[in-house]
Amino acid sequence: MSGAGVLAGLGTALPARLVTNEELSRHLDTDDEWIRSRTGIGQRYWSDGASTGDLAVEAGQRALKAAGTDTVDLVVLATTTPDHPCPATAPDVADRLGLSGVAAYDIAAVCSGFIYGLASAVAHITAGLVGSALVIGAETYSTILDPLDRTTSVIFGDGAGAVVLRSGSVDERGAFLGFDLGSDGALKDLIVIPGGGSRERAAAERPQPAGAYFTMQGKPVFRHAVTRMTSSAGALLDRTGWSPASVDRFVGHQANARILHAVADQLRIDGARTVIDLDRVGNTSAASIPLALSRACGEGLLSPGDRVLLSAFGGGLTWGSTALLWPDITAL
């Protein structure tokens, strides 16, 4: 093993259609106060035709430009909403980015997908298999939501975020300082799209599989999200030797503002250091962490050398955390 995976550039993309809480309240039994008080979400973006791959390409282009390069050796796409069940979306994204021929694959770890994608790409780099990678989290959850289910429709948004990683030294800014990953398949039904796979497949007599919509059991998911993100992020702090007080920015998966603040409280990280982005984009699943990082960059919340802790939780159940010293990079 040699070197480290180092963050070199960041890019994001959002679809054009802005969906406010007020718009949703016109056909759902809800209102702006109900949504904000329970989730912290004020609006989200939904695609009017752009696919997950389309958003991934746009974010990828911006990340490559931010990194000052037009090529990488590997493309990893984290998504729950691929363009097709088969084939994977990443090879098409790579081709459209002018990267045909490089290794490219999808990762399905739901809202933990971006952390899993980072871990996979960094492992390739440190093993000497590739010298650089593009990691993308992209989602179009609007395509899998039940429009009449207020427990999910008010939460999720569409978007994409991408980062370029390069080979470098573990002691330089931007190097990822280890990962903590985990899963619990016994709780797989807490977050699930029941239909469409080999257990409940489409057939000639029933072309639309039952249970085609995304479902989530909110209360237990909330509890497990807080527990698992706290444990995982805590393990990463132990590994890096950082104290909670030394963390400059905590960037968690943007599922719910109450979850993020609960995790920060349990970790004893100052709540003012927690980055919140879901108020403007909702829960964008695998795209949420890079989107939040981009916003933090744009608002001057991240400076070179800052200690940044990332943590996520998602269906599977899955969870993961990583950390880095923030580099001097461009976010587009």
From Swiss-Prot:
Catalyzed reactions per annotation: malonyl-[ACP] + acetyl-CoA + H(+) = 3-oxobutanoyl-[ACP] + CO2 + CoA
An MF annotation (GO) of this entry: beta-ketoacyl-acyl-carrier-protein synthase III activity
Pfam families referenced in this protein's UniProt entry, alphabetically: ACP_syn_III, ACP_syn_III_C
Region entry ACP-binding, spans: 254-258
Coiled coil: none
Enzyme class: transferase
GO cellular component, one term: cytoplasm
Origin superkingdom: Bacteria
Chief localization: cytoplasm
Pathway(s) where this gene product acts: Lipid metabolism; fatty acid biosynthesis
Described function: Catalyzes the condensation reaction of fatty acid synthesis by the addition to an acyl acceptor of two carbons from malonyl-ACP. Catalyzes the first condensation reaction which initiates fatty acid synthesis and may therefore play a role in governing the total rate of fatty acid production. Possesses both acetoacetyl-ACP synthase and acetyl transacylase activities. Its substrate specificity determines the biosynthesis of branched-chain and/or straight-chain of fatty acids.
Entry text on domains: The last Arg residue of the ACP-binding site is essential for the weak association between ACP/AcpP and FabH.
HAMAP family to which the protein is assigned, alphabetical: FabH (MF_01815)
Subunit structure: Homodimer.
Family of the protein in this entry: Belongs to the thiolase-like superfamily. FabH family.
Name the UniProt record assigns to this protein: Beta-ketoacyl-[acyl-carrier-protein] synthase III 5
